[in-house]
Curated annotation (Swiss-Prot):
Function description: The glycine cleavage system catalyzes the degradation of glycine.
Subunit structure: The glycine cleavage system is composed of four proteins: P, T, L and H.
Family: Belongs to the GcvT family.
Name recorded for this polypeptide: Aminomethyltransferase
Length: 370
């Protein structure tokens, strides 16, 4: 049965086109995906991401548990509220999910995981947590709104109670704090996102989400759907689980080496496989592609490099760059001239570093000589 967020009627009243996304009835756009993309890059937009899963982890051994569970190291989290992006791996080094974890106390961490992986994630977390005596509590009582764009933070801060505004203004990137709206709604506010823009992701009680959404819109934030969220995250060089990596792909094969912490004395799940991969040299690599010809790069298209064949993982037309962009997984090593098979024609593409766009600006080299 398709699940709905509490904002479902609100989305429909706003004229949203709804689609099934991982078993959830979600808005793909509210009229124009392109306009919503540009609004987030230039002003602000709000996404309903309440389909994602919030999990609270508690216990005296929660930190040792997470040191074992995650490829990135929670030892990096020294200050309450700080967040960490990490992959959770299986014993073969494949990615069970990518997630964000927040350090809220020595015996309390909060995790946000993907919607499509909810059941397997919860089963895996509970299995791995049991020997550590850590409780795994899903929080279906919390909704999530992502308010993103250059104006997003100022608007949200303007809706907070006076006593919290200074702390919210000073809140650093990849950090969170507990605050209240000026009408008393409890808000867990994180300076994180999935768009390449500044902004907040806000966890709040389900029974308050419609009212707070309406206040955001009244303050000038425009609704944005999953279509714009996808083009924004792709421009920002951010992976989508299930499309860019899965349980058969290691972080090293998904351009996520920066999320792997091979710190001494920490035996995390999958570490031995990653160390062997690193020593041998990865068999595959994930690269960024830009197509200067008119057209769109799409998932599944064949990619040819000097090292052999690969394929496009995520591909789209970039509204910011007005070019086709993509992630591709190809054989490791020298790439040479790279081409993509588009309807039987080998079309040349350029290899560029991620991200394609950061805070509204094309990154060096992405636009080429033009």
């Amino acid at each position: 049965m398709t699940q709905k967020t509490l904002l479902n009627d609100t989305h429909r009243a706003l004229g949203a086109k709804m689609v099934d996304f991982g078993g959830w009835d979600m808005p793909i756009h509210y009229g124009s995906q392109l306009d919503e993309h540009h609004l987030v890059r230039r002003e602000s937009g709000v996404f309903d991401v309440s389909h994602m899963t919030v999990v609270d982890l508690r216990g005296d051994q929660v930190k040792p548990f997470l040191r074992r569970l995650l490829a990135n190291s929670v030892d990096k989290l020294k200050v309450t509220g700080k967040a960490l992006y990490s992959c959770m791996l299986n014993p073969r080094g494949g990615v069970i999910d990518d997630l964000i974890v927040y350090y809220l106390g020595d015996d309390f961490f909060r995790m946000v995981v993907n919607a499509s992986t909810r059941e397997k994630d919860l089963a895996w977390l509970r299995e791995q947590a049991a020997p550590f005596g850590v409780t795994v509590e899903q929080r279906p009582d919390l909704a999530i709104l992502a308010v993103q764009g250059p104006q997003a933070r100022d608007i949200v801060i303007g809706l907070a109670r006076e006593a919290d505004r200074a702390a919210l203004t000073k809140l650093g990137r990849f950090a969170a704090l507990q605050a209240q709206s000026d009408d008393g709604i409890e808000l867990f506010v994180a300076r994180t996102g999935y768009t390449g823009e500044d902004g907040f992701e806000i966890l709040l009680p389900q029974d308050a989400v419609v009212a707070f959404w309406n206040r955001l819109l009244a303050a000038g934030v425009k609704p944005a759907g999953l279509g714009a969220r996808d083009t924004l995250r792709l421009e920002a060089g951010m992976n989508l689980y299930g499309q860019d990596m899965d349980e058969a792909i290691s972080p090293y094969e998904a351009a996520l080496a920066w999320t792997v912490s091979l710190d001494e004395g920490r035996d995390f799940i999958g570490r031995d496989v990653l160390e062997a991969q690193k020593a041998a040299g990865n068999a595959r690599q994930m690269i960024g592609l830009v197509m200067d010809e008119k057209g769109v790069l799409r998932h599944g298209q064949a990619v040819t490099t000097a090292g052999g064949q690969g394929e496009i993982l995520s591909g789209t037309f970039s509204p910011t760059l007005a070019k086709g962009i993509a992630f591709a997984r190809v054989p490791a090593g020298e790439l040479g001239q790279v081409t993509v098979d588009i309807r039987g024609r080998q079309v040349p593409v350029r290899v560029v570093k991620f991200p394609f766009v950061r805070e509204g600006q094309a990154q060096p080299g992405v636009l080429g000589d033009a």
